[in-house]
């Protein structure tokens, strides 16, 4: 089972040594080399990093990476065996390649735990943390291109919980479908 989990980063930082983890320098176009694979080679959208953040690395993986399973984590956020707070404790709890193989033999997609927001909806959380224009435009594009998803979009926006942080590992065919859909909206 060939698993590659991108570790999105914009700076040098501690990285897991397990070969399933692949540090990727997101927004690498025009930046100094920090020693990681850059998202600026092959078919890429690295120059859009200011607006797309880690999605430039995800796009790069979609177009250039050969793997049976592809995932995304962040240089300070990983899937761990148990919840831990300190960086040092987290390093010892990050899932290994062997643990990923076992998990992915049972589930085609793994996402981050559900996070609950008791005092606000996903829409209000997004609007408070980001520019509301982006969500409004995405909603409009979904209504135009994928009207069958409009009700689900509204439902998710009105919820007070979500699987946050853009972290997942997916079987390649599902990853391809996800990227095809998402990047057609962005």
Predicted regions and their residues:
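ER/Golgi luminal nucleotide-sugar-dependent glycosyltransferases, focusing on the catalytic module
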Residues: 1-186
């Amino acid at each position: 089972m060939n698993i590659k989990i991108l570790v999105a980063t914009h700076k040098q930082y501690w990285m897991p040594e397990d070969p399933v983890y692949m540090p990727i320098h997101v927004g690498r176009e025009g930046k100094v080399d920090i020693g990681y694979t850059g998202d600026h080679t092959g078919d890429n959208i690295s120059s859009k990093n200011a607006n797309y953040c880690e999605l430039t690395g995800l796009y790069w993986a979609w177009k250039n990476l050969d793997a049976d399973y592809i995932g995304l984590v962040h240089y300070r956020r990983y899937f761990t065996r148990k919840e831990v707070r300190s960086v040092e404790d987290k390093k010892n709890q990050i899932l290994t390649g062997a643990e990923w193989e076992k998990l992915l033999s049972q589930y085609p997609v793994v996402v981050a735990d559900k996070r609950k927001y008791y005092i606000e909806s996903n829409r209000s959380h997004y609007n408070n943390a980001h520019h509301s224009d982006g969500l409004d435009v995405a909603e409009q594009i979904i209504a135009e291109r994928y009207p069958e998803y409009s009700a689900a979009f509204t439902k998710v926006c009105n919820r007070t919980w979500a699987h946050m942080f853009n972290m997942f590992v997916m079987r390649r065919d599902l990853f391809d479908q996800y990227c095809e859909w998402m990047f057609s909206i962005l």
